[in-house]
Amino acid sequence: MKTILSNQTVDIPENVDITLKGRTVIVKGPRGTLRRDFNHINVELSLLGKKKKRLRVDKWWGNRKELATVRTICSHVQNMIKGVTLGFRYKMRSVYAHFPINVVIQENGSLVEIRNFLGEKYIRRVRMRTGVACSVSQAQKDELILEGNDIELVSNSAALIQQATTVKNKDIRKFLDGIYVSEKGTVQQPDE
């Protein structure tokens, strides 16, 4: 069964400016600019109202899979709005039983060096995605803080760090060493 029209709107806050170029969405805010291309999805994007403070996503004559993309695009745009206003922050903790994991940040927070993992001499180097800054927490021991505007780049950088410390050829129920995401949040606190 095909639905004639499915649509959804996203409210745009005052301090955020959104422009559309075809199916490319550009979001400008206090923390910077994010752009995302939705050309591969066959939907209509339009800005509503005199002040253009609402974004509407329309899908005509879609089946179930195609209608799901409407909500997906809205969620992506909401994440972009949240990124340019509040920013995203992931906190990661080092977990070790015996050999303390030594983490060093190089090149202004764009390269993470992991040493002494399970007592190995090999140095693991993880390059952060562009626009993601990594730092060592001052308040908490063995904690890394990743910050950026794009939730996908921040979470992907966290995944790269976690995957760099996978335990090979051992029983992973016993060897739980690694660097894991402990907290996900925003850089600035939302004004409730």
From Swiss-Prot:
Keywords: Acetylation, Cytoplasm, Ribonucleoprotein, Ribosomal protein. Coiled coil: none annotated. GO terms for cellular component: cytoplasm; cytosolic large ribosomal subunit; cytosolic ribosome; synapse. It is found in: Cytoplasm. Component of the large ribosomal subunit. This is Large ribosomal subunit protein uL6. The lineage of its organism: Eukaryota, Metazoa, Chordata, Craniata, Vertebrata. Gene3D superfamilies: Ribosomal protein L6, alpha-beta domain (3.90.930.12). It comes from Rattus norvegicus. The modification N6-acetyllysine is found at residue 121. Belongs to the universal ribosomal protein uL6 family. Its main location: cytoplasm. GO terms for molecular function: rRNA binding; structural constituent of ribosome. Component of the large ribosomal subunit. The ribosome is a large ribonucleoprotein complex responsible for the synthesis of proteins in the cell. GO terms for biological process: cellular response to nerve growth factor stimulus; cytoplasmic translation.
